[in-house]
């Protein structure tokens, strides 16, 4: 392990922030949630059954949007949504079979039912099962095979499972980053998202779907926000209703922001593509674009900290669906963020923490650690 610490006396320029959040109903976020749910359920099954987690990677989930017809007061899905179940899950340990398809299908259904309350999953969702058990590159076939990767996803015994050992090895050569503190733009975007997905909001605005997107641009003390908020057609009886409620939502968001941060100025835009003459509106059957052709993939959405902040250091590795034992993007993402937050909590200095892995190296021993700190470092700081 090599540790490098750089200390800067000038803070990172923080007068501009650009933050994006993809809500729970966005196709990319749907894929992230499905992948993570499958990994968690599979890991829990393995821990309960074997005492350790078997090799798996389910981080390539995709979705192909369906087709819907929307009218004021009613709508229907006319072509089903397709979930691409891509990835690898160990299907057995010796003679003990693991119900991988059942685990995956149950997780998919649970996620979709949780996000889209009006979606009939059994009727309008197709799952294309692309699970496989290929061992991956690196196994040279020789007599008296002794490479534990030969049966990587079909292990014959516990002693042949690298995940059962304490010295788990990194699955990839990669880099992740964590930083602290989050700036005001991130906090505002998170607070707005939390408000729009709160139980109180849902109870007051049942016509609002879950495929909400927030784009925030802060320039010093002025913040511009564009929100894309879907309306559910069965709860939207007319164009006039849509117009009135859209304006009400805009006013609500503006009021929420201004009362929470009176020292800042705000301008709010909502559903900017709307054309009342055509009409072309963000009107949906179940509350998301997934019903009408929009595709999604794991890793294209929010980072592990819940936002997409292109004005801060950002990991490009997907973390959803990664194996929690040795997948760098899963393990190091949380470790890097934890270190950065602890540095900030103890010193008051902003910090960026970069963890670089090396394939085949112990995950407990990062290849390189790079830490950037803004401030005068106290030599007595632990």
PLM feature segments, named:
Residues 317-353, 373-379:
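C-terminal structural cap/anchor segments
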Residues 19-20, 81-88, 173, 225-236, ...:
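Short, hydrophobic beta-strand segments
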Residues 108-239, 245, 253-257, 261, ...:
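Glycine-rich, mobile lid/loop segments that gate access to catalytic sites or pores
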Residues 275-289, 359-379:
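Short glycine/threonine-rich loop-to-helix capping motif typified by GTGT followed
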Residues 44, 48-124:
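Glycine-rich, N-terminal phosphate-binding loop and its surrounding beta-alpha-beta segment
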Residues 1-19, 152-169, 218-223, 227-229, ...:
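N-terminal, Lys/Arg- and Ser/Thr-rich interaction peptides
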């Amino acid at each position: 392990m090599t540790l490098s610490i750089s200390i800067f006396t000038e803070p990172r320029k923080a007068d501009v922030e650009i933050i994006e959040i993809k809500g729970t109903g966005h196709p990319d976020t749907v894929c992230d949630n499905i992948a993570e749910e499958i990994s968690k359920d599979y890991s829990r099954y393995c821990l309960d059954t074997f005492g350790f987690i078997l090799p798996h990677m389910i981080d390539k989930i995709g979705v192909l949007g369906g087709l819907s017809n929307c009218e004021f007061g009613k709508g229907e899905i006319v072509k089903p949504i397709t979930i691409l179940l891509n990835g690898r899950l160990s299907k057995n340990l010796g003679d003990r079979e693991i119900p991988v398809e059942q685990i995956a299908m149950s997780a998919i259904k649970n996620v979709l039912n949780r996000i889209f309350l009006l979606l009939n999953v059994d009727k309008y969702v197709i799952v294309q099962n692309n699970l496989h058990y290929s061992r991956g590159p690196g196994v040279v076939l020789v007599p008296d095979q002794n490479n534990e990767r030969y049966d990587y996803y079909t292990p014959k015994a516990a002693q042949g499972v690298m995940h059962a050992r304490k010295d788990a090895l990194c699955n990839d050569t990669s880099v992740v980053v964590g930083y602290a503190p989050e700036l005001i733009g991130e906090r505002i975007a998170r607070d707005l998202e939390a408000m729009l997905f709160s139980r109180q909001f849902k109870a007051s605005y049942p016509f609002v779907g879950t495929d909400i997107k927030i784009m925030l641009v802060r320039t010093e003390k002025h913040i511009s926000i564009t929100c894309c908020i879907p309306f559910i057609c069965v709860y939207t009886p007319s164009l006039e209703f849509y117009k009135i409620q859209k304006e009400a939502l805009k006013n609500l968001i503006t009021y929420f922001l201004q009362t929470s941060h009176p020292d800042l100025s705000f301008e709010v835009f909502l559903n900017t593509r709307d054309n009342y003459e055509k009409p072309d509106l963000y009107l949906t059957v179940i509350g998301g674009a997934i019903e009408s052709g929009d595709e999604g993939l794991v890793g294209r959405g929010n980072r592990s900290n819940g936002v997409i902040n292109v004005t801060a250091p950002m990991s490009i590795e997907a973390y959803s669906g990664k194996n929690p034992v040795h997948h760098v993007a899963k393990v190091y993402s949380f470790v890097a963020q934890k270190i950065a937050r602890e540095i900030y909590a103890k010193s008051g200095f902003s910090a960026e923490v970069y963890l670089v892995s090396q394939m085949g190296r112990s995950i407990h021993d990062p290849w390189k650690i790079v830490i950037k700190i803004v401030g005068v470092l106290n030599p007595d700081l632990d």
